[in-house]
């Protein structure tokens, strides 16, 4: 016997429903009962049991509309949850099947994701979700360390160059792996552990172009110019990387932004959370350099990518 439908719920909705079972066997199923089980906190099961009575061989029957569940208000529209349906009858038949709960329909003000690992990206417009971020700029140019990085764009640099490797004051779990060191690049990204490529041409993520694993806050060909600097600050609560008054190589637009790595573990599988903030955001590089193929990439790339470069979320790359 197998269920042949999915249950659709809106975030925060409580609903009673029946489940249709098809008896694909050759024997009559007598006194069929079922129980829904899940360990997810996204779904509260108010009444987990229902019955189908007798289902003849080759027939289909609905349960008595006794199942009752409540979807969490934090569940992301468009996502789904697979729960277990335990089925038994008085003849000794027992089987566990999957039952699919689908939550809402994706709208503009819903987070991006999930990727295959389970990450979502929430932005400040996702106000219907408790996890939506609020802008709270933490200025570190006066309290942090100036990494004294230098980059004149288009792969040219001098002095200390475009990369710095720094130790984190805590282990940061990213895609299930603990890291205690990051590589910071002037071109608007960080990678975990040692990376020796400045990757000034931005590409879609996930993908083979660029470092991995990475967090791209504003991956583009960026220059330090006369006033651009990259700062680093950390304490027991977070590590902050701030790109301050950087300039795009293509259009000389000003960019100031920061990545905050939080010392927490409130994401799926105990991973740490990430916050990206923009004080000055001008996504103006169109990627059309008349004299120098190939293109540098249209606009900036924003998102995350795992260590195999085969999973991630791309928030922006027009």
Where are the model-predicted features located?
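Low-complexity, acidic Ser/Thr/Pro/Gly-rich terminal tails and inter-domain linkers that flank the onset
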Residues: 1-12
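Short beta-strand elements of extracellular/lumenal beta-sandwich folds
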Residues: 11-27
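Intrinsic-disorder/low-complexity, polar/charged segments enriched in Ser/Thr/Lys/Arg/Asp/Glu/Gln
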Residues: 14-16, 60-66, 96-98, 238-240, ...
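Short acidic, flexible loop segments centered on an aromatic residue
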Residues: 22-43, 48
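Terminal connector regions
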Residues: 32, 64-106
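Intrinsically disordered, low-complexity Pro/Gly/Ser/Thr-rich segments with frequent PxxP/GP/PP motifs
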Residues: 44-75
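Extracytoplasmic Ser/Thr/Pro-rich, glycosylation-prone low-complexity segments
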Residues: 71-73, 102-318
